[in-house]
Amino acid sequence: MKKITLTDKRKNNYYYNEAIKTLRTNIQLSGQSIKTILITSCFPNEGKSDVVLSLAQELGSIGKKVLLLDADIRKTAYVGRLGVEEEVRGLSQFLSGQANINDIIYETNFENMDIIFGGPSAPNPSGLLSENVFQVFLKKVREYYSYILIDTPPIGTVVDAAVIGRYCDGAVFLIEPGNVRYKDAQRALSQLERSGCQILGAVMNKIDTKADKYYSFYYIHYGEYYRRAEEENK
């Protein structure tokens, strides 16, 4: 396994960090069988990748071995986000037969956290993710990790998350209140449910914590989001 140094320049506030700890606790309380977790959102730019990275770091800090898998093989963001300047190989190259597993898993300088980058943009992402090779790959790597956190493209725009959901133990749905309509969230969640993946809960992101005007988030069961949204639409 290759080693790589990542740079995280984010400066998260107290409320954000506490929310991450709450999310981590809820993930752990979901049960020992929940290891492969898909994290998606309705639309782009809702802060999903920041939450995935923070959750991976938090789980690693308590001794859990974590694999962060960037499954957005349409438009990967982690290379630039984490200051990677060297050439790396990624998931799209593995799925297309251009690399093997050992070529794409990188040991990072973050405690107990490995990463797989998305790789170059693939011409047929949902097709590659539907292949048996991806399912076999997930079964193999889950033997070595406490948690596999899969960052997918937004399910409200492309079908990839629903395809990946067929092979996952659970899913977390990220929502930015005020910018995502209830009907859009309901439609996206319904598509994810049809994949057969258990929805563990929802993350309400970019919540204005009035105490310090920073953005934070909190974790709720997704059914609670439905109830609140319905009340707001009355």
Tell me the role of every PLM-derived stretch.
Residues 140-143, 155-178:
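Inter-motif core of Ras-like GTPase G domains
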Residues 66, 148, 171, 199-200:
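Hydrophobic anchor at the start of a short beta-strand
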